[in-house]
Each structure stands twice: as structure tokens, then as C-alpha cells.
């Protein structure tokens, strides 16, 4: 919506689609038709601590009771779907699960710290909903999404492809009195999980058997078909932003066309030109001898070793093993570059 995240829609993002549809529908249902049931979904840490209502840690942290929070979090989840396409549904779900669990612990710590140091009681006033993992996604968004300037205002200030996302996050951050506690706990959990602190990414993860089960049962329900009638250009808010996005698209297409042209020429001309200086080897080739008395060219270096773990990650995203191997070799084992290359083709 706001950033260049590949194809529009929810193609290759079934988990993001389910997080958009199910909690939003339940939030509307509770607000319009079942307001008397909202008390069951109140996020009340005081009741959890004193009355042992442990179930509130689950029910109170899934569905938003404020429609403004529902709207803002849905927009953010839609824009953060790029991480599901990049990492795969299993790793994306593991990140959300890990940050969701860790943020509950940080909520307790922050509430107790406020009570101890400042005498502020916030245990019964925390906002409900799937908010902490949404704030946690700002950590990989800040660290891994490149910043592209699209306009410059007031001297050093500039508008980038990430500005509107940060503004939307700020709107969600200021939508309630104590939502900043949930936001800080979400950011802290995102930092812990993204930096692999204390190996939490190995403990709080989705098992492979569970991922396969949901891929067989729920993924067909929430999967979306590949868009066919689009130019793969993000729709900017102004003509200048759209023009900048088209220029970025042309640059990417030029790079990929040069890459493909180099591959074709290398296959046709063999070893007459050492294309390995320009492009990493994609396939192992046999040495080719040319004119009888002419000394053959130096042997091409062996193909780059590819990590099977990275191949497995790309295959979990839906790519074939051959395409995954070729993209990883072409990108010198850079998983992010290989993923972006495959998503563009």
C-alpha cells in the first residue's frame, strides 16, 4: 500500500490474510452485535495476577476492542506482509508467536515497574488486541527494508518510502493512554527475537509438523491467486511518488535484463569471454577447448556452495529447488537478494 512490497494484494501471504480477516471480523462482531461479550476479551493483568484468570493472556491479546486500533493494525499488517513473502509463512508465524509470548512477559515487567517506581496502576487499562507483534514487526522493518528518498522538504527533512508506515505506527502508538506500554514491550520482544537473543528463536517457533498441518488445512482457504493484470508498481499517494516508484521499477528491470542477457551470452559463447568476472557461475560447465593449437581458457571455478538451510527456506516460500539453487548462487548466498530476485520473476 505504502511501500514497494512486490505484487499488490495478499499473494503468497496466507497468514497475513488470515490476520486481516479473522480478528477484524471478530472485532466488528463484538462492537456491533455482541457488546455484552466484550468483557471476556479485556486485557486485565490485575485479574490475571490476583484472580488467576490466565485465559485473559490469550483472549485479551488477540482481538481489538477499539475499532481505531483494529483499522491501524490491519493497515500495518497488510504492509508488513512483505516479511511473510521474504521469510516464508512458517518463519513469519514463528516471529509473531515469539514476540507475542515475550511481550506478555514485558507487559508484566513494565506494569510492575510503573507501580513500584511511580505509583501508577495500569494493569487494568492496557489495550486489547494483537498489537504487540505488530509493533515488533517495526524492528525488521527498520533493519532490513531499504530507505528510499522520494521527496525532500524543509532542508534536511525528507519523505521516504517508509515515512507513512512510521506515521501510521505513531498514530497507533498515541491512540490510547497506556498503549505505549504494549508498544514498548512489542519493540523489546521484536529486538530479542530478531537478534536471536538467548536463542529464543529456537524455543518459540512453529514446529514443522504444525506448519505442514496448517499448510494442508488452512492455507488453501486463505491463499490468494497470483495477480495477472498489474504492472507490479506500488501505488503512491502523489504523482511524484508514483514516478519515483516507476523509476525504481525500471532500474530493477534493467538490472535483471542485464543479468539474463549475460547468462544467455555465456551459454552461447562458452569460455571465449570470462563472464565469471561479471556474474557468479550459475551452473557447472565443462571446459571447452577451441582452436587446435590454441591454449584453452582457464578452467571455470567450481560452483558456489549453497547452504541447504537457505534452500529449504526458499522452498518453504513455494519456489522450486532448482530456482532456489540458481538464485542463491547468483546472489553469492545472500538470502534477501535471492528472495527479491525470485519474487520479481
UniProtKB/Swiss-Prot annotation:
The chain crosses the membrane at residues 92-112, 126-146, 164-184. Pfam families: UBA (PF00627). Gene3D superfamilies: DNA helicase RuvA subunit, C-terminal domain, Rhomboid-like. Residues 36-91, 147-163 are extracellular. It is found in: Endoplasmic reticulum membrane. SMART domains: UBA (SM00165). It is a multi-pass membrane protein. The keyword Signal applies. Residues 305-345 form the UBA domain. GO terms for molecular function: serine-type endopeptidase activity. GO terms for cellular component: endoplasmic reticulum membrane. Keywords: Endoplasmic reticulum, Glycoprotein, Membrane, Signal, Transmembrane, Transmembrane helix, Wnt signaling pathway. Glycans are attached at residue 161. GO terms for biological process: negative regulation of canonical Wnt signaling pathway; Wnt signaling pathway. InterPro entries: Rhomboid-like_sf (IPR035952), UBA (IPR015940), UBA-like_sf (IPR009060), UBA_UBAC2 (IPR041928). Its main location: endoplasmic reticulum. It comes from the Eukaryota. Residues 113-125, 185-345 are cytoplasmic. Restricts trafficking of FAF2 from the endoplasmic reticulum to lipid droplets. In association with LMBR1L and E3 ubiquitin-protein ligase AMFR, negatively regulates the canonical Wnt signaling pathway in the lymphocytes by promoting the ubiquitin-mediated degradation of CTNNB1 and Wnt receptors FZD6 and LRP6. Interacts with LMBR1L, FAF2, AMFR and VCP. This is Ubiquitin-associated domain-containing protein 2. It comes from Macaca fascicularis (Crab-eating macaque).
Amino acid at each position: 500500500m505504502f511501500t514497494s512490497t512486490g505484487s499488490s494484494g495478499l499473494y503468497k501471504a496466507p497468514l497475513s490474510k488470515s490476520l486481516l480477516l479473522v480478528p477484524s471480523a471478530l472485532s466488528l462482531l463484538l462492537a456491533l452485535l455482541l457488546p455484552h461479550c466484550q468483557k471476556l476479551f479485556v486485557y486485565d493483568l490485575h485479574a490475571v495476577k490476583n484472580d488467576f484468570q490466565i485465559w485473559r493472556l490469550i483472549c485479551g491479546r488477540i482481538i481489538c476492542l477499539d475499532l481505531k486500533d483494529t483499522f491501524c493494525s490491519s493497515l500495518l499488517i497488510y504492509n508488513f506482509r512483505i516479511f511473510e513473502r521474504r521469510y516464508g509463512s512458517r518463519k513469519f508465524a514463528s516471529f509473531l508467536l515469539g514476540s507475542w509470548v515475550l511481550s506478555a512477559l514485558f507487559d508484566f515487567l513494565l506494569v510492575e515497574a510503573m507501580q513500584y517506581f511511580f505509583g501508577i496502576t495500569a494493569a487494568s487499562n492496557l489495550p486489547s488486541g494483537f498489537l504487540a507483534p505488530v509493533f515488533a514487526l517495526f524492528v525488521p522493518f527498520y533493519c532490513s527494508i531499504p530507505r528510499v528518498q522520494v521527496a525532500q522538504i524543509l532542508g534536511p527533512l525528507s519523505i521516504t518510502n517508509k515515512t507513512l508506515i512510521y506515521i501510521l505506527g505513531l498514530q497507533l502508538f498515541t491512540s490510547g493512554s497506556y498503549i505505549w506500554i504494549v508498544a514498548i514491550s512489542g519493540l523489546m520482544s521484536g529486538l530479542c527475537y530478531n537478534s536471536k537473543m538467548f536463542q529464543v528463536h529456537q524455543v518459540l517457533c512453529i514446529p514443522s509438523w504444525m506448519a505442514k498441518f496448517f499448510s494442508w488445512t488452512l492455507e488453501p482457504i486463505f491463499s490468494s491467486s497470483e495477480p495477472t493484470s498489474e504492472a507490479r508498481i506500488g501505488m503512491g499517494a502523489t504523482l511524484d511518488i508514483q514516478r519515483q516508484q516507476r523509476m525504481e521499477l525500471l532500474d530493477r528491470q534493467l538490472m535483471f535484463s542485464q543479468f539474463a542477457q549475460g547468462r544467455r551470452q555465456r551459454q552461447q559463447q562458452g569460455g571465449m569471454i570470462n563472464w565469471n568476472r561479471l556474474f557468479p557461475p550459475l551452473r557447472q560447465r565443462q571446459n571447452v577447448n577451441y582452436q587446435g593449437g590454441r591454449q584453452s581458457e582457464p578452467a571455470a571455478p567450481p560452483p558456489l556452495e549453497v547452504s541447504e538451510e537457505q534452500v529449504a527456506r526458499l522452498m518453504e516460500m513455494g519456489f522450486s529447488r532448482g530456482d532456489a539453487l540458481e538464485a542463491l548462487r547468483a546472489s553469492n548466498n545472500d538470502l534477501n537478494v535471492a528472495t527479491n530476485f525470485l519474487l520479481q520473476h
